[in-house]
Amino acid sequence: GLTYTYKLRKEAKWYTSEGEEYAPVTAKDFVTGLQYAADKKSEALYLVQESVVGLDDYINGKTKDFSTVGVKAIDDQTVQYTLTRPEPYWNSKTTSTILFPLNADFLKSKGDDFGKVDPSSILYNGPFLMKSFVSKSVIEFKKNPNYWDAKNVFVDDVKLAYFDGSDQDALARNFVEGAYSYARLYPNSSSFEGIKEKNKDNIVYSLQDATSYFLNFNLDRKSYKFTAKTSDAEKKSTQEAVLNKNFRQAINFAYDRTAYGAQSQGEDGATKILRNLVVPPNFVSINGKDFGEVVASKMVNYGKEWQGINFADAQDPYYNPEKAKAKFAEAKKELQAKGVQFPIHLDKTVDLTNKAEIQGINSMKQSIESVLGADNVVIDVHQLSTEDFDNTSYLAQTAAQKDYDLYNGGWSADYQDPSSYLDIFNINSGGVLQNLGLEPGEANDKAKAVGLDVYTQMLEEANKEQDPAKRYEKYADAQAWLVDSSLAIPNVSLGGTPTLRKIVPFSTPYSLAGNKGVESYKYLKLQDKTVTKDEYEKAKEKWLKEKEESNKKAQEELAKHVK
């Protein structure tokens, strides 16, 4: 259907940062929240702009009447959304911040001060109240004693300490001293062996989460502030190379991800962070099979080099020097016919404070150059200040400002559907298209040269299908195309890291999409002693069994919902 109606809890209240009751949470607050996001041109509007009736027209100024938008307060406890098209995954969007409520009276009283970096600039209706926010230092939350479900909030105080990665021993040191309840460990840090000796039974690896990272190429680079290239001929040669599929595949097969993972994880955990698809392989299932299994079955259509490939997490199915050399030989022949000069220089920038990533990128450089030969390909690593790195990559406002040939970016799902990942490369609206040097919606011959127009057609066909199994099958086709293109070369996920913790295993919420997963501290419990590996594995086994049953039930309910 196109109409979704939600009933709100009468017990839900707004509170100030001091814990004073301000007002009840009403359906009108959800209308106000979406209107505020639209008026302020929120960067997260892409999630709902084309989903909610009338919202796109309001955002683009075709109407100034927000009452034409498909979000209504039917009464104080009933909010209703009307969609432009069926979205079987709509319910999973509702946990995203773009649809969060906002009290109109409070918003008016704060004016331009609303939402500033000050706990008193917003209201709270959840389990915690923010008490302090000191940039690059600490964020502190206190339990909201008046929260409607306070009985399920087991921690009174939450402090999040800023960590820039420059002192890798700091997290473990603070855990050992009792300041932290959770600490990520860095096996290549100077103190790790000592920590490991004292905690050999207590180091546990976190679950891999739904955030996927992948290398991509800048297909239409315009900025060369940070480069090792010394001539226009070198720039042109690199541009020709990255547009060549055999060249991209050669890089893919020459990249030793296990060696890359070892730089932050150590040898014991080197593979525990590895991810091999943009869409996590277990994100959805299709007739009892994981999404990754179905994608693997489709790779036979793309050549013998993909035969028998396994896309499961925590192993590297790509690294293969023989395949890499064969693909490069094909690429070199094709590129030399176009007058390309070798070696191809690929600029890769990295934040100079991120020691683990510097080690990882140097490992990638070593594996690619040793397999393909430094007389053929050179990875030029540029260590930049945090400001320069951010401004030429993550924070760059346009594709033309992206100053690199290779970029390692990531994406996590906004909602429970493969499109949440795969649409990011849509040539009309892709969320990471700028990282490829392309502007969404603008004609670019480079996008067509690598087949992104064909890929976008596959996405559009998949999005027409509402039956979950058939829909996911079509998205598996699109993911298979993306693998073969090597435009996005998956490497790691978040999670999968060695930790010390006093958090009771699997007491925290879990979600593959939205904002109700590990970022929520409701239900979280602490224990006095450090969690042991044995405790963690037993809890994990029980949790996985319960999760499998829960997922099966949810999939059955979804199938009924869309019919």
What do these predicted regions represent?
Residues 2-7, 30-33, 79-80, 126-128, ...:
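Short, well-ordered beta-strand elements
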Residues 64-67, 76-77, 83-159, 170, ...:
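Gly/Pro-rich hinge or "lid" segments in bacterial periplasmic/extracellular proteins
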Residues 131-145, 161-230, 258, 262-268, ...:
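Extracellular/periplasmic solute-recognition and catalytic clefts
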Residues 174, 269, 306-414, 448, ...:
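Ligand/substrate-recognition segments at binding pockets and active sites
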Residues 250-298, 352, 356-366, 396-563:
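Detector for C-terminal structural segments
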